Each structure stands twice: as structure tokens, then as C-alpha cells.
Amino acid sequence: MEADVIKLLAAGLAMGLGAIGPGIGVGILGFGALQAIGRNPEAKGSIFTNMILLVAFAESIAIFALVISIVLIFVA
């Protein structure tokens, strides 16, 4: 295999595997938030605010994977 092919394959795997965890995490966060709002509708604002903050933290991992993939493609 050529070096370019290996570089693109590594970048694709880095992004793909780096997005699996955040995707599962966001799904679990959404599920938990909906259950909590269903049990206590009065606390909707607080739950929603905390959920948005935690989703941002979870998605930051996917953004790091994207940056690593871009570095693998253009720098390595």
C-alpha cells in the first residue's frame, strides 16, 4: 500500500472510532434527561441546562478526533 492510502485510512479510522463514544454518550444523556423530566417536570429548566453542558463536553471528544484526523491527512 502507498503511504497516502495508509494515511487516509488512519484518518478515517481515527474519526470513525473517535465519534462512536460521543455518539453513544449523547444518546445516553438524552435518554436520562428525558426520564428525569418525565419524573419531575418542574425541574425541566435545570435538567435541560445540565444536559446541554454535558452534551458539549461529550462532543468535544469528537472535535478532538476531527482535529487529529485533519492533522493526519495534511501534516503527517
Curated annotation (Swiss-Prot):
One of its GO terms (cellular component) is plasma membrane. It is a multi-pass membrane protein. InterPro entries: ATP_synth_csu_bac/chlpt, ATP_synth_F0_csu, ATP_synth_F0_csu_DDCD_BS, ATP_synth_F0_csu_sf, ATPase_proteolipid_c-like_dom, F/V-ATP_Csub_sf. Keywords: ATP synthesis, Cell membrane, CF(0), Hydrogen ion transport, Ion transport, Lipid-binding, Membrane, Transmembrane, Transmembrane helix, Transport. Pfam families: ATP-synt_C. One of its GO terms (molecular function) is lipid binding. The record marks E59 as: Reversibly protonated during proton transport. NCBIfam families: ATP_synt_c. F(1)F(0) ATP synthase produces ATP from ADP in the presence of a proton or sodium gradient. F-type ATPases consist of two structural domains, F(1) containing the extramembraneous catalytic core and F(0) containing the membrane proton channel, linked together by a central stalk and a peripheral stalk. During catalysis, ATP synthesis in the catalytic domain of F(1) is coupled via a rotary mechanism of the central stalk subunits to proton translocation. Belongs to the ATPase C chain family. This is ATP synthase subunit c. The lineage of its organism: Bacteria, Bacillati, Chloroflexota, Dehalococcoidia, Dehalococcoidales.
